[in-house]
UniProtKB/Swiss-Prot annotation:
SUPFAM superfamilies: Porins. Residues 26-55 have a biased composition (Low complexity). It is a multi-pass membrane protein. Keywords: Cell outer membrane, Membrane, Receptor, Repeat, Signal, TonB box, Transmembrane, Transmembrane beta strand, Transport. This is Probable hemoglobin and hemoglobin-haptoglobin-binding protein 2. Residues 1-24 form the signal peptide.
Length: 999
C-alpha cells in the first residue's frame, strides 16, 4: 500500500509540474509529428559536407546525430516515442555503463538474463527473454542460444555449454535503441517481446568542424575490480577519414554482498562466496572511409570483440548427489570460456537525390561468432589434499637416490633387535619419518618387472645400484634391505633403469599414489557464421499536401550454425615416482606404445576423442523486404505504416566423415530400425546410424512471415500528444528446436520440422504532456498476445530393441518432442517523465526530476505465470547540469517490489513432489540509491565518479533468483536449507570512477 501511495504521489507531482505551465509557456511553433517507429537499418550517418540540395529533414537528422555524440544531455526534453528508449554514447558515459546490464540499469520493464558463470544472456522484455528479444549490431542479428527445452534439460544444468547471447563493447557504441513490444519491422525474426539495437560509432560523430579527434579514457569499478582503458582516434585527410576505438578490460568475478566475509575454501552447492574468475575483454572498432565526391562514400569496417573468463567453478558439484547422501568434493572444475565476434563489412552510400531515393546504402557483412565453454576437472594440488599425488611419507630423490624428506636414508620399524645389521628384519609397512613418527601403510612395494627409474632423475651411471626390499616370503611386508644392480635400457630415445634381479621377493619402494593428477577436459563450441547483404533507401516527397518520409529496402543473408565438441584426458602435476615409461614387451623386447599396452595411463597415454556434436549443422537462408512510411496529414495528425516480408529456409548440412559426428546411441534405430540381430554388428550399426542421420538431414524447412506496424500520432494541442500502436512480430523456430535429437530410455527427444513460427501482437496507447521548456510526462497502457509458443511435451512411450545378438531385449523409451502449445497474454502500464525545474525559479536552473514506472501482469497457457516478467519497478531521478557543463550529478532511487509467489512457475514441481508450482527462492522488495557525478575542471578533461547501492542494502534481483536451478550440478544451492543462495546476491556498496582526456 505504501508503494502505491508513493507511486500516485510521484505521478501527481510530475503531472502538476508539467500540465500546470502548459498554457503559460506554449511555444509559438506548432507541434511536429515525427516518425515514431522507424526501421533502424537505414543509412543515418551522412557526411558533414552534405550537398546543398539535401532537404531540411535530412539536415536536421544529421544535426541531431552530431549533437547526440557531443553533449552531456542530448534530446532529454524531447517527448519519448511510444514504447521506445534511445540511449546515446553520452548518456551511457554519464551513467558509467560498463556492460549490457548497466545499459538498462535505470530503465523499467527491461532487464538482462543472468547465466551464472557465463555472465548475461540477452534481455527480458514484456514477459519473454533471450531469443524472443531481438538483438542486432549495425543491422546484423547476433548469435542465438540453443533454446530447445530438451537441450536445456539435458545439458544446461551442468555448465558444459556457453549457451548465451553475445554482448557488445559499450565504448564502441554510438547509440542503443530499445523497443518494447512486438516489432519485426526492424529486426525480422525474434522481435516478440522487443528488440535491442546497437549502432557503432563513426568518424563523422567526432569530426565536427575539425579534422582530428583524440581521446583516452581510464576507468575502474570496485564491484568486480575491473579496470579499463579506451583509446579513440579519428581523423580526416582530404577525401579519407578513419576511426579507431580500442578498449581493454581486466577484472574478476562480481563480488556478491558480504564477499570478503565468506569462506573461500568451501566447495560445492553450499558455497556462499562468488566463484573466482579472471575476466578479460578486448575490443577494436576500425572504420576507414573514402569520399570521392560529396555524394558518394565507401567504408571498410572491422568490429572485433573477445570476452574471456578463466577461473574455478567451486560451487559446481562434480558428484551428482541426492540430499542427505553427500560426500566431500575431491576434484574441482576449472573453466576457460570465451566469446569471440568478428564482423568485417563493406558499405557504399549515395546521397544524390533521384526519383527513387534521397539516400542509398548498400552493405555487405561477414560476421563470425564463437561461444566456447572449456572445462578441466582435476584436483588442485597445494590447495587441498589430492590422492593422485599423495606422499605423506615425504619421500624424495636426493643425489639420484630415494631418501626421507631431510635427505637421510629410509628407515622402517625393526622386527627383531639384533646388533648385526645384515640380520635385521624390518616391517616395511611401517615407515619412520624424520620426526620418529611411524607412518603406516603409505608406501607401495612393486615387482622389479613393473618398476622403471627415469635416468634423468635417478643415478644410472655404470655399476649403479639401488636399495630395495627383499621379503622373507613372496607375500607380506617383513624383510630386509638389499642393494641390487640396475640395468640400463633406452626406450624411444630416452634412458631408463630397471632392477636386474627378477626375484619375486624383491620389491621397489615408492609412494603408493600414482604420482600425477588425472585431468578430464572438454571443449564445446557453438559457432554462428553470417554473411549478409543489405540495401536501404530513403525518400522524402509530398503528395496532395501530405508529407511522406519513406524508407524501404531488403536483405539477403546466409547463416551457418554448428556445434563442435572435443574431449579427452591427460595428467598434470606429474611427480618423480610416476611411472615414466610404458616399458617393453617381455617376449619381443620392443617398447610398448599406447596402442600395444594393456595398461591405461593418463600421463603416458593422454586421450583426445574424435570431434562430435549433438546437433546437425544447419544453414539458414533469409530474404526480406520492408517498407516504412511516416506521412504527416496535418501538423496535428500523422501515421506510421510499416510492412515486412521474410522468407527463411533451413537446410541441414551433414557430410559423413567430415562433419563432427553425432554419437551413435542418440540416433541408432530412432526412425529406421536396426535389422534383426544386428545390434552387435558394428558395420550394421554404423550403416543404420548413417541412415537415420540422412533421414533427419533431408528434412528441409521453409517459413514465410508477414509483419506489420501501425502507429498514429495525434497532437490536439501544443502540449498534449496521443499515440496509438498496433504491431505484429514473429520468431521462427531455431534450428535446434526443430532438429535436436537425443535417444535414451529415460529421455528421448524427437525432431519436429512442422513447428509454426511464434507470433506476438502488441496494442499500446500512450498519453504525453510535453513542453519544450518544462519536459514531459508520458503514460502508456499496453497488451501483448503471444501464440504458438514452442514447448517440450511428453508424447508417448515406445519400445526399442536394445542389447546384442541373441539377447533380443526391448526397453520402453519415453518420447518427447517440441510442439506449438502455449498461448500467452501480458498487459501493463508504464510511466516515463522528466521535468526541468529552471522555469520554476532561477536558482533551480539546470535541475531536473525524472520518474519511471512499470507494472506488468501475464499468464500463458491459461493460468501459468510468465517467469520473465519483472516485479513492479520504479526509478526516481534528481539531476543537475551546470549551464556550461562544468559539473553535474544524478541521484537515482530504484525501488523494486517483491516477486509474488503466485507470479512464479516451477515446471518441475511434480517431479520434485512439491505441493504447488511456485518457485521457492524469490526476490524480496528492495530500494537502491545511486549517486553519479562528473566534473570538467578544464576543457579537455572530464572526471566521472559514482557510488552505487549507497546504503549498502543486501538484495537479490529476480533475474538472479530465477537463475537458480532446482537440479543439476551448476547454479544450484542447498534447496532444503538455502545455503549457497548468498552467492546470487548483488554487490553491496561499490564505486566507479573514470578519467577522460579529449583533444
Amino acid at each position: 500500500m505504501t508503494n502505491f501511495r508513493l507511486n500516485v504521489l510521484a505521478y501527481s507531482v510530475m503531472l502538476g509540474l508539467t500540465a500546470g505551465v502548459a498554457y503559460a509557456a506554449q511555444p509559438t511553433n506548432q507541434p511536429t509529428n515525427q516518425p515514431t517507429n522507424q526501421p533502424t537499418n537505414q543509412p543515418t550517418n551522412q557526411p558533414t559536407n552534405q550537398p546543398t540540395n539535401q532537404n531540411s529533414n535530412v539536415s536536421e537528422q544529421l544535426e541531431q546525430i552530431n549533437v547526440s555524440g557531443s553533449t552531456e544531455n542530448s534530446d532529454t526534453k524531447t517527448p519519448p516515442k511510444i514504447a521506445e528508449t534511445v540511449k546515446t554514447a553520452k548518456t551511457l558515459e554519464r551513467e558509467q555503463a560498463n556492460n549490457i546490464k548497466d545499459i538498462v540499469k535505470y530503465e523499467t520493464g527491461v532487464t538482462v538474463v543472468e547465466a551464472g558463470r557465463f555472465g548475461q544472456s540477452g534481455f527480458a522484455i514484456r514477459g519473454v527473454d533471450e531469443n524472443r528479444v531481438a538483438i542486432n549490431i549495425d543491422g546484423l542479428r547476433q548469435a542465438e542460444t540453443l533454446s530447445s527445452q530438451g537441450f536445456k534439460e539435458l545439458f544446461e544444468g551442468y555448465g558444459n555449454f556457453n549457451n548465451t547471447r553475445n554482448g557488445a563493447e559499450i565504448e564502441t557504441l554510438k547509440e542503443v535503441n530499445i523497443t518494447k513490444g512486438a516489432d519485426s519491422i526492424k529486426n525480422g525474426s525474434g522481435s516478440l517481446g522487443g528488440s535491442v539495437i546497437y549502432k557503432t560509432k563513426d568518424a563523422r560523430d567526432y569530426l565536427i568542424n575539425k579534422d582530428y579527434y583524440v581521446s583516452y579514457k581510464k576507468g575502474y569499478a570496485t564491484e568486480n575490480n575491473q579496470s579499463f582503458d579506451t583509446l579513440t582516434l579519428a581523423g580526416r585527410y582530404k577525401k579519407f577519414d578513419v576511426l579507431v576505438v580500442t578498449t581493454s578490460r581486466n577484472g574478476h568475478e562480481l563480488e556478491n554482498y558480504g564477499y570478503k566475509n565468506y569462506n573461500d575454501k568451501i566447495q560445492g552447492k553450499k558455497r556462499e562466496k562468488a566463484d573466482p574468475y579472471k575476466i578479460e575483454q578486448d575490443s577494436t572498432l576500425l572504420k576507414l572511409s573514402f569520399n570521392p565526391t560529396e555524394n558518394h562514400r565507401f567504408t571498410f569496417a572491422a568490429d572485433l570483440y573477445e570476452h574471456r573468463s578463466r577461473g574455478q567453478d567451486l560451487s559446481y558439484t562434480l558428484k551428482y548427489q541426492r540430499s542427505g547422501n553427500e560426500t566431500p568434493e575431491v576434484d574441482s572444475r576449472h573453466t576457460n570460456d570465451k566469446t569471440k565476434r568478428r564482423n568485417i563489412s563493406f558499405s557504399y552510400e549515395n546521397f544524390s537525390q533521384t526519383p527513387f531515393w534521397d539516400t542509398l546504402k548498400l552493405t555487405y557483412s561477414d560476421q563470425r561468432i564463437k561461444t566456447r565453454a572449456r572445462t578441466d576437472e582435476y584436483c588442485d594440488a597445494g590447495v587441498r589434499h589430492c590422492e593422485g599425488t599423495d606422499n605423506p611419507t615425504g619421500l624424495k630423490v636426493t643425489n639420484g637416490k630415494i631418501t626421507r624428506r631431510d635427505g637421510s636414508d629410509l628407515q622402517f620399524e625393526e622386527k627383531n633387535n639384533t646388533a648385526k645389521s645384515s640380520d635385521k628384519t624390518y616391517d616395511f609397512k611401517k615407515f619412520i619419518d624424520t620426526d620418529k613418527r611411524v607412518i603406516d601403510d603409505k608406501l607401495v612395494l612393486n615387482n622389479p618387472s613393473d618398476t622403471w627409474y627415469d635416468c634423468s632423475i635417478f643415478n644410472c651411471e655404470n655399476n649403479a645400484k639401488i636399495k630395495v626390499f627383499k621379503g622373507n616370503n613372496y607375500y607380506g611386508y617383513d624383510g630386509k634391505w638389499k642393494e641390487v644392480d640396475l640395468e640400463i635400457k633406452e626406450l624411444n630415445g630416452k634412458k631408463f633403469a630397471k632392477i636386474k634381479d627378477n626375484d619375486r621377493k624383491i620389491k621397489s619402494i615408492l609412494p603408493s599414489s600414482p604420482g600425477y593428477l588425472e585431468r578430464l577436459w572438454q571443449e564445446r563450441d557453438l559457432d554462428t557464421n553470417t554473411q549478409q547483404l543489405n540495401l536501404d533507401l530513403t525518400k522524402d516527397f509530398k503528395i496532395w499536401h501530405i508529407e511522406h518520409n519513406l524508407q524501404y529496402g531488403g536483405s539477403y543473408n546466409t547463416a551457418m550454425k554448428r556445434m563442435v565438441n572435443r574431449a579427452g584426458n591427460d595428467a598434470s602435476d606429474v611427480q618423480w615416482w610416476a611411472t615414466p615409461t610404458l616399458g617393453e614387451d617381455s617376449w619381443t623386447g620392443k617398447p610398448h606404445t599406447c596402442a600395444t599396452t594393456y595398461e591405461w595411463n593418463a600421463n603416458l597415454c593422454p586421450r583426445v576423442d574424435p570431434e562430435f556434436s549433438y546437433l546437425l549443422p544447419i544453414k539458414t537462408t533469409g530474404k526480406s523486404v520492408y517498407l516504412f512510411d511516416n506521412f504527416v496529414i496535418t501538423d496535428y495528425l500523422s501515421f506510421d505504416l510499416g510492412y515486412r516480408y521474410d522468407n527463411i529456409h533451413y537446410q541441414p548440412k551433414y557430410k559423413h566423415g567430415i562433419t563432427p559426428k553425432l554419437p551413435d546411441d542418440i540416433v541408432k534405430g530412432l526412425f529406421i530400425p536396426l535389422p534383426n540381430n544386428s545390434n552387435s554388428d558394428p558395420n550394421k550399426v554404423k550403416e543404420n546410424v548413417q541412415q537415420n542421420i540422412d533421414y533427419i538431414a533431408k528434412q528441409n524447412k521453409k517459413y514465410k512471415a508477414h509483419s506489420y506496424s501501425f502507429v498514429s500520432t495525434i497532437d490536439p494541442t501544443s502540449f498534449l500528444r496521443l499515440q496509438l500502436k498496433y504491431s505484429k512480430g514473429f520468431r521462427t523456430p531455431t534450428s535446434d528446436e526443430m532438429y535436436f535429437t537425443f535417444k535414451h530410455p529415460d529421455f528421448t527427444i524427437l525432431p519436429n520440422t512442422d513447428l509454426k513460427p511464434e507470433i506476438a501482437k502488441t496494442k499500446e496507447i500512450a498519453f504525453t504532456l510535453h513542453n519544450d521548456d518544462w519536459g514531459f510526462i508520458s503514460t502508456s497502457l499496453f497488451k501483448t498476445n503471444y501464440k504458438n509458443f514452442i514447448d517440450l511435451i511428453f508424447k508417448k512411450q515406445e519400445t526399442f530393441k536394445v542389447g546384442g545378438s541373441g539377447r533380443g531385449e526391448t526397453l520402453p523409451f519415453s518420447l518427447y518432442q517440441n510442439i506449438n502449445r502455449d498461448n500467452a497474454s501480458l498487459k501493463g502500464i508504464e510511466i516515463n517523465s522528466k521535468v526541468f525545474l529552471g522555469k520554476m525559479a532561477k536558482f533551480m536552473d539546470g535541475f531536473n526530476l525524472s520518474y519511471k514506472y512499470t507494472y506488468q501482469k501475464g499468464r500463458m497457457n491459461g493460468n501459468i505465470p510468465m517467469n520473465a516478467i519483472q516485479p513492479r519497478t520504479m526509478v526516481y531521478g534528481l539531476g543537475y547540469d551546470h549551464p556550461n557543463h562544468k559539473f553535474g550529478f544524478d541521484f537515482y532511487t530504484t525501488h523494486v517490489a517483491s516477486k509474488n509467489p503466485e507470479d512464479t512457475y516451477n515446471m518441475f514441481y511434480k517431479e520434485e513432489n512439491k505441493k504447488d508450482s511456485t518457485i521457492k527462492w524469490r526476490s524480496k522488495s528492495y530500494t537502491i540509491l545511486d549517486l553519479i557525478g562528473y566534473v570538467q575542471p578544464i576543457k579537455n578533461l572530464t572526471i566521472r565518479a559514482g557510488v552505487y547501492n549507497l546504503t549498502n542494502r543486501k538484495y537479490i534481483t529476480w533475474d538472479s533468483a530465477r537463475s537458480i536451478r532446482s537440479f543439476g550440478t551448476s547454479n544450484v544451492i542447498d534447496q532444503s536449507t538455502g545455503l549457497g543462495i548468498n552467492r546470487f546476491y548483488a554487490p553491496g556498496r561499490n564505486y566507479k570512477m573514470s578519467v577522460q582526456f579529449e583533444f
